[in-house]
UniProtKB/Swiss-Prot annotation:
Pathway: Aminoacyl-tRNA biosynthesis; selenocysteinyl-tRNA(Sec) biosynthesis; L-seryl-tRNA(Sec) from L-serine and tRNA(Sec): step 1/1
Matching HAMAP family: Ser_tRNA_synth_type1
Domain of life, source organism: Bacteria
Annotated EC: 6.1.1.11
Cystine residue pairs: none
InterPro entries, per database record: aa-tRNA-synt_IIb, aa-tRNA-synth_II, aa-tRNA-synth_II/BPL/LPL, Ser-tRNA-ligase_type_1, Ser-tRNA-synth_1_N, SerRS_1_N_sf, SerRS_core, tRNA-bd_arm
Class in the EC hierarchy, top level: ligase
Function: Catalyzes the attachment of serine to tRNA(Ser). Is also able to aminoacylate tRNA(Sec) with serine, to form the misacylated tRNA L-seryl-tRNA(Sec), which will be further converted into selenocysteinyl-tRNA(Sec).
Domain comment, as recorded: Consists of two distinct domains, a catalytic core and a N-terminal extension that is involved in tRNA binding.
Lineage: Bacteria, Pseudomonadati, Pseudomonadota, Gammaproteobacteria, Enterobacterales
SUPFAM superfamilies: Class II aaRS and biotin synthetases, tRNA-binding arm
Binding site for ATP: 270-272, 357-360
Protein localization: Cytoplasm
Record's protein name: Serine--tRNA ligase
């Protein structure tokens, strides 16, 4: 959420910045709300002065033994007016807040303008894209030959865009997540968290998923008890970022406790209505997928550098797996609702002959902290200040699995296991096709 003073006092500047995200700031609606709020606030102030003066008059009348009936009636009417106007201003403030919650974060000046993938800037490439002298198979074909990917059973059990992994493919998938977590804990200094997969509405507002992305989420509803008509509503997490960020809700830390670095491996659930064609093929875009998520909570002066660091941490996973990738600086129209600057890491998929996003690394600045009231004190000033938050996929486990299957396939009918994963798979070096 944007700072209220910034929004109202520098409206044109904010509107110009948000236009880069293709967001139109409705000045008339916002100004109307604000003008009405000021009018009501002045009425409250006048009524409070009138009530104070009336109280003095009543005290004086009591001392002079004057009949208080008329004065007490005036006092009751004043209180009723105050209650009514305060109720109106609460409703108005709620409307203003709801509008504020629909406004995205301001993009950094340094990121490029644009709304298409072609407007993103390639920062660098890492690794060698191999040339194969045999016919390449995609990850679904490879998975079926190995007997490790079962789409039909998943469709029968649940529906489309779900998967079942089994055998050595499931083993490889598990090894990947364990490897990633270990690297981030042991080498990068993160603390591991085990998190709820169901979250409440406050958490979704706090992280910025609501109100915009309601229709992209899986919502549940359960009866509190057999004898009760009350229902409890929760939502399945779209990313571990949501519960990780909300750990800091209504928390104030000392600056010496910063940075706070958190990591979690969770399934993620996204409805994401719409069609993606071949881009949704297989494990590329499913309703349920696993991801290792990184979140950093830092001093405002450190978030620019922290974005480079958290991105490097995600890159390190791809480098250790020896998977070719490229690093993209996203244009203003492509960054997320909450982000002010984002790097995407795109891994090379040889069967598709293209790069595919495997990690998104973003600086959120104080956008989430203002929603969740996450603050710090420096020990000098009594007043606390808002923290900055950052997040990154470290990385998407399913897409890493896809990249390994396709990049490590061999002509003799095997999948070579990356060297760093072999210790996580009891020393295995290859996965063989079922018919071998």
């Amino acid at each position: 959420m944007l700072d209220t003073n910034l929004l109202f006092n520098h409206f044109e500047w904010v509107a110009k910045k948000l236009a880069r995200k293709n967001f139109v700031l409705n000045f008339d609606e916002l100004n109307q709300y604000n003008d009405l709020r000021k009018i009501l606030q002045k009425k409250i102030e006048k009524l409070q002065i009138d009530r104070k003066n009336l109280s003095k008059t009543i005290i004086l009348a009591k001392s002079q033994q004057i009949n208080l009936q008329s004065l007490q009636k005036q006092a009751r009417l004043l209180n009723q007016k105050l209650i009514l106007i305060k109720s109106e201003i609460r409703t108005l403030k709620s409307k203003i807040k709801q509008y504020q919650l629909s406004i995205p974060n301001i993009p950094d000046d340094e990121i490029p303008n644009g709304f298409k993938d072609q407007d993103n800037i390639e920062i660098m490439r890492w690794g060698k894209v191999h040339k194969y002298d045999f016919k390449l198979l995609d990850h679904i074909t490879l998975g079926k030959l190995i007997g490790g990917i079962d789409l039909s059973s998943a469709s029968k059990i649940t529906g489309t865009r779900f998967i079942i992994l089994k055998g050595e493919i499931a083993y490889l998938h598990r090894a990947l997540s364990q490897f990633m977590i270990d690297i981030h804990i042991q080498n990068h200094g993160y603390i591991e968290y085990y998190l709820p997969y169901l979250i409440n509405v406050e958490s979704l507002y706090g992280s910025g998923q609501l109100p915009k992305f309601y229709d992209d989420l899986f919502h549940t509803q359960s009866v509190v008890s057999v004898n009760s008509s009350k229902c409890s509503t929760y939502t399945l997490i779209p990313t571990a970022e949501v519960p990780l960020v909300n750990i800091m809700r209504s928390v104030t830390v000392h600056k010496n406790e910063l940075p706070i670095k958190m990591v979690a491996h969770t399934p993620c659930f996204r409805l994401e209505a719409g069609t993606y064609g071949y881009r949704a093929h297989g494990l590329i875009r499913t309703h349920q997928f696993d991801k290792v998520e990184l979140v950093q909570v830092v001093h405002p002066d450190q978030s620019v550098q922290a974005l480079e660091e958290i991105t490097n941490h995600a890159e390190k996973i791809l480098q250790l797996l020896e998977l070719p990738y490229r690093k993209m600086l996203l244009c203003a129209g492509n960054i997320s609702f909450t982000s002010c600057k984002t790097y995407d890491l795109e891994v090379w998929l040889p069967a598709r002959n293209e790069y595919c996003e495997i990690s998104s690394c973003s600086n959120i600045r104080d956008f989430q902290s203002r929603r969740i009231n996450a603050r710090f004190k420096d020990g000098i000033n009594k007043r606390s200040k808002l923290l900055h938050t950052l997040n990154a996929s470290g990385v998407a486990v399913g897409r890493a699995l896809v990249a390994i299957l396709e990049n490590y396939q061999l002509e003799n009918g095997c999948i070579k296991i990356p060297e760093v994963l072999s210790p996580y798979m009891n020393g295995m070096t290859h996965i063989h096709y079922q018919n071998k």
